[in-house]
Amino acid sequence: MSAGRCGRLQEERGKDMSKDKYESPLCERYASKEMQYIFSPDMKFKTWRKLWIALAETEKELGLKDENGNPRITDEQIAELKAHADDINYDVAREREKLVRHDVMSHVYAYGVQCPNAAGIIHLGATSCYVGDNTDVIVMTEALKLVRKKLINVINELAKFADQYKDLPTLAFTHFQPAQPTTVGKRATLWMQELLLDLSDIEYMISQQKLLGSKGTTGTQASFLELFGGDHEIVRKIDGKIAEKMGFAECYPVSGQTYSRKVDSR
């Protein structure tokens, strides 16, 4: 189960649950406040709204028109969306979900209640995975960055420890048997080396993270081709603009509605 799908479970537990942290027995015992926030409902749904803003800005910048040839999206509508990007009206979304049984459509509705002038452009042309999968990638990337930060701190402290005890002798072992002398500092460098290998893997994973983008129902972007009158050149620009606005270098070049689930398994 991916990050966003796990996080979805806690929103359903009731009104009194905190929205700024991910809750589970394991989290309560072992997770940092920073990591709990990354997997929290607040992080998830605020990211959904950032993605909706990025999509609306992209469609406006690419010249989306209505049936009369007028701009479909205005600066005023985008400003309204931005004004309510962080104040999630959970109660409205919860009540709406009781009716429609769909988390994304419930939050589209709730956002529209706060932004009546922009309600018609929220999620325009997109599918649920536009917010669901892209948010999962963003959450996983932020979690990896936090692990990287903490790992670097541990390596730095171990380096100080190794230097402090570089001349302190101790007995080294081979095959779990006493062997030859070494120093405590040298032994600590072995731990550091293991963590540096881990750090290299994490750096690589972060560098390889890509967004899904906005591929439509089956990965063909058919809904966007319809919105833009069949102009393939314009539609090809959508993913790149969204990636840039969300702080990523690129999106996956091909997909179905979802990104490859190998991303989750890695």
Identify what each model region corresponds to.
Residues 83, 256-260:
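Short linear loop/turn motifs
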Residues 5-16:
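Short, Lys/Arg-enriched N-terminal segments with co-localized hydrophobic residues
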Residues 18-245:
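A helix-coil-helix interface module used to build multimeric assemblies
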Residues 262-266:
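A conserved active-site cap/scaffold subdomain adjacent to cofactor or substrate pockets
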